[in-house]
Amino acid sequence: VGKNRIRMLREQHAFILGIPVTTFSRKASPLVVWEGSHKIMKYYFKKEFCKIDPQDWKDYDFTKVYHNARNEIFDTCKRVEIHATPGESYIVHRMALHGVAPWDGRARSSKGGRVIVYFRPDMDLEPSSWLTRP
């Protein structure tokens, strides 16, 4: 949140759904996910958020916890680039560490550019369910 990039749990989405709508090459800024990272994030989050009333999560700064989890993930999890074409889609676990790789100079895309539609539906449950559900 903000210019200091403070981490706060403002959205409790169920998953991330990516749907490519244009054609582009594999190195055109692919989605990157760290395999198994959701388990590490869940461990760190459970340890931290169990001390806080779920109604207060949205205002709690968990930046330090997030960075500690992320550092462990970078050290222990395999980085995987995800590529899909129109007609395909992918789902990412809500707690998986993910990002977008830089555009490779050799990458190509259709005239419309690289367009992927992302959906992050809310998890319509009690806040603590976000932490305890698989």
Give the label of every model feature segment.
Residues 8-25, 86, 118-121:
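Short, conserved beta-strand element in jelly-roll/cupin
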Residues 6-9, 17, 31, 41, ...:
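Generic detector of leucine side chains in alpha-helical contexts
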Residues 1-4:
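Short acidic (Asp/Glu) patches
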Residues 43-46, 86, 90-91, 95-134:
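Non-heme Fe(II)/2-oxoglutarate
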Residues 20, 36, 94-96:
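Short, well-ordered beta-to-alpha junction loops that form the rim of enzyme active sites
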Residues 24-91:
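Double-stranded beta-helix
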Residues 12-18, 28, 79-81, 97, ...:
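Extracellular structured ligand-interaction cores
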Residues 8, 78-81, 108:
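Short, solvent-exposed segments of well-ordered alpha helices
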